[in-house]
Amino acid sequence: MQASMLDSQWRLTIFSPRRKVKVSQMNSRFIAVLLTATILPWVAQAQDSYPSSPVTIMVPAAAGGPSDTVARLVAQSMSKTLGQQVLVENMGGAGGSLGAANVAKADPDGYRLLLYHIGVATFAALYPNLAYKPIEDFSSVGLITEVPMTIVGRKDLEPKTFADLVAIVKKNATTVTFGTAGTGAVSDLCGRLLQDALGTKITLVPYKGMGPAMTDLIGGRIDLACDQTTNTTTQIKANEVHAYAVTTKARIDVLPDVPTVDEGGLKDFELSAWHALWAPKDTPAPIREKLSEALKTALKDPMVIERFASLGTVPVAQDMATPAALDQKFKAEVERLAKVISEAGK
């Protein structure tokens, strides 16, 4: 009987609800410790060996455009530093937001990156129903370059100076056609900023990329366009279009005879198509730092510098090709451009 009581007492102790909780807590702690001991070294090893396979840079625009050109130059140089191929993939649509969504949903392992321009900073304002949030859902790697924009016109357009163009556009705004690469594209931003500076509305004509827009401009079917010098310099030098102004504070070396917008009488008008590199959110800091270092090396590569110069741009300073610098720039541009888009009424 005594043994039976002891046995009963033992069972009550072991299988009482309180004891179950204690055993469960002990098991949970043990599992947590075990997982930490096994997973953390694996994660650290994965980060140390990164990259162990090819890296893909997503350009959310058609091949052959300015962003694609920048991406392929940078990818070629980064491949040497990382010891793995850096591939470029193109996915256009919705002003770049579709390709960006592809990266936002990717695994945060550093193998799928986004390279695009200032347009990323417009997505939240232009597409309020996006399935992702640009600031929250991307991890910054670094800035790459700030490409000047050039306002160009069909070569038979009557005014030949930017000041004369401004005067004529103000008088005939509704009849002036301005080609863009679509809502949210940097060319579209240029058109919106021009409207704001002129204090009038012009007819913005959206195309599926700047290629078709430039074709129509050269063919005389639209009056004006605004695109990155990486895309317009060849046409300007071939006398296929007329260059009116660059959208930076100073003239640029590759087009020294083209005045600035400010020189033409529009004050406080400045726009550059800065390009940058992002990874999906939660990408580990060591991986982003490794990517940033490879990016910095690419921006010092003589081949990249020479090719950028021929396109009318230069790499950013080394301290700008960092996650922190891009974070600051990106947040400021999102705020600035949201106001521009709101005032333009989309």
From Swiss-Prot:
Keyword terms, alphabetized: Periplasm, Plasmid, Signal
Entry's localization field: Periplasm
Coiled-coil ranges (or none): none
Cellular component terms per the entry's GO annotation: periplasmic space
Entries under CDD domains matching the protein: PBP2_BugD_Asp
Signal peptide extent: 1-46
InterPro entries membership: BUG, Bug_dom1
UniProt entry tagged with the keyword Zinc-finger: no
Entry-linked Pfam families: TctC (PF03401)
PANTHER family, sorted: BLR1237 PROTEIN (PTHR42928:SF5), TRICARBOXYLATE-BINDING PROTEIN (PTHR42928)
Family: Belongs to the UPF0065 (bug) family.
The protein, known as: UPF0065 protein in the TAR-I ttuE-ttuC' intergenic region
Originating organism: Agrobacterium vitis
Top-level taxonomy: Bacteria, Pseudomonadati, Pseudomonadota, Alphaproteobacteria, Hyphomicrobiales
